[in-house]
Design a protein with these regions (language model features):
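Mature N-terminal, pre-catalytic/accessory segment of carbohydrate-active enzymes
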Residues: 1-183
């Protein structure tokens, strides 16, 4: 294979697909397999919405972008977005993400039905992450790359062993929401 990049896969295994929403491809490579050795159990963290996290890699805390909590400022009538990462060295079945109403100290509420989650699925790309010279047309890379990109409605999901799964969280703040800090 030569140089291995995060999300890289052997493109000779890629079947010709009829449309974009077919099941994910699953034959990507892990760049840092030893990192999984100290990842027993299930892990989760909020990650940066400006970073891509690869399925076969343990999330790395670059620039303190992984956190156990999420905080943002948002206007009434707007949407706040966050990325939740779930990873495990062991296979897990029926993983669910749930929430509760957000409440202010004054007793105001953002109802939990205004908080939604979508699974981030991986799609085939001609270029590795952060490639500065990506163009439409033929790629100089012989391999394809799986990039986290497509959102899919989330009820629950299975997490294969040594896998990271991003989940996109959206909080739609109602227009009539009273100002305050909601938790």
């Amino acid at each position: 294979l030569g140089q291995v990049y995060p999300g890289q896969m052997d493109s000779t295994f890629v079947p010709v697909r009829s449309h974009h929403y077919d099941p994910e491809l699953t034959f990507d490579f892990c760049v840092n397999e030893p990192a999984w050795s100290n990842q027993a159990g299930i892990h989760s963290a909020f990650g940066s919405t400006d970073r891509l996290y690869f399925r076969k890699e343990v999330p790395v805390n670059h620039d303190n972008d992984l956190s156990s909590s999420y905080s943002t400022t948002v206007w009434r009538g707007e949407r706040a977005n966050a990325q939740i990462l779930v990873w495990s060295s062991e296979a897990l079945e029926q993983v669910r993400v749930s929430t509760q109403d957000l409440r202010s100290a004054e007793g105001n509420i953002i109802p939990k039905d205004r908080i939604t989650f979508e699974l981030v699925r991986y799609v085939l790309s001609n270029y590795p992450y952060a490639e500065k010279k990506a163009i439409c047309g033929e790629s100089p890379y012989k391999s394809g790359f799986l990039m986290p990109d497509r959102f899919e409605t989330l009820d629950r999901f299975d997490l294969p062993s040594q896998t990271t799964r991003p989940v996109w969280m959206m909080v739609d703040v109602p227009r009539g929401t009273a100002p305050g800090t909601y938790k």
